[in-house]
Amino acid sequence: ISKAAKIKSPDVKIVVQEKQLGTGHAVKQAERLLGKSGKDILILYGDVPFIKSETISKLIKARKTSDIAVLGFDTKHPGMYGRLITNGENIFGIVEAKDATQEQLNISVCNSGVILGRADLIFDLIAKIGSDNASAEFYLTDCIELAAKAGFKSSLVLCDEKETIGVNSLEELAQAEELFQRAKRIEFMEKGVQLNSPETVFFSFDTEIGKGTVIEQNVVLAPAVTIEENATIRAFSHLEGCRIFPNSTIGP
């Protein structure tokens, strides 16, 4: 992960949580790099890949009128997600499912884990977190109740539940891939790319396709593929690391 991050951003700073003592403890590992900063920090998760830039922009907007902005989602199947204790757009606490009362388990607005706030405030709150809970861990979520008791305001920003899907198993990885492919198919068709059998065409994260291109069934576009305008990709083609020029026809 560190190597991949440095390829994308050579100046990135890496810290490691040697012992898994909870999400609060994990964030605390970055305190020596960020703790004295008066700047905002955005806490994201590597296994939650679908959060949109527009959603981050909403968090930034909410942060302008509150001390902390929290990303949540409303779901019919809250399961083991933490529940948000709210009053309108204000959040007064987050309760993990395993520590929740039956009444709290009935809450449908859940925590995504994504938080935006000023670095020094976040780390001051983390310093006050205890581990007296069902997992004996330091929950980052406890910061919100501590903030409320100290007079700080935490605001709720809601997003689509699909944006918060995590990848913690091979089954969830397959589900995430399915969501990704479905979104890319819609994206390209809206841009004027003709997919003759959309469910049989597979894209990569960096695929680029020009308007007017026709892609037939059972096509795989591996990484580093650019297809310019008005090309035709025949059925059963597998492309990778290539550029297809305008008006070209490519077959398997």
Give the location of each predicted region:
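Conserved N-terminal catalytic core of the sugar/cofactor nucleotidyltransferase
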Residues: 1-44, 48-58
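Short loop/edge segments at beta-strand edges and connector loops
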Residues: 16, 45, 72, 158, ...
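Conserved core of the sugar-phosphate nucleotidyltransferase
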Residues: 51-134, 141
